[in-house]
């Protein structure tokens, strides 16, 4: 399960930045035997790391919260007006990540960058960040929409440069859209990747549980055949 820290700021804090809420998440995780495998700085959809001076604060707060939740991967999103479009923006972001990386290393948290740029551009940013704690959070849906060969990119990046995956093909159910998931799961398995892949699939409010079960059942079946 991936936890979003929310976007609405109250008294200078993100919604989950509350000891009682953190404790409740930990309790529910233990109670239902569902690990908190990652977190997300959702606030970066409002204050993007590519240029907003407020962004580093939210990332630093999120590193602390990720550690408190006993998790290891913090998703750093770059979408909408904050999507990376120019080399200058990518260079700035790589430098910003380099400044944030020491705190992530200290907390043993991976900063996973999720965006709409190519695998090659992502690697250039990682190399600019100069930290083993800055990796790619690979979203097969986003990269497909951006026109990239996702199987080729996954194999090229390798398990050393990918921290986690998002599996989705919105607005479709998995297996009913553009993406052929069998080659994707084959590629992930061939890497020897042993981390987490989260379903970030659309679901209808009135059929939420059924939709989640349908997508999970499908991807498990594909994994068994991979």
Show the residue positions of the predicted features.
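Conserved beta-strand positions in the central sheet of alpha/beta enzyme cores
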Residues: 1-2, 38-40, 75, 112, ...
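Short acidic, glycine/proline-enriched helix-loop-strand junctions
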Residues: 11-34, 93, 107-109, 195, ...
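A generic structural signal for short
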Residues: 13-14, 50-51, 88-89, 111, ...
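Active-site acidic/histidine proton-transfer and metal-coordination neighborhood
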Residues: 28-38, 44-136, 145, 209
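Histidine-acidic metal/acid-base catalytic patches
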Residues: 70, 119-226
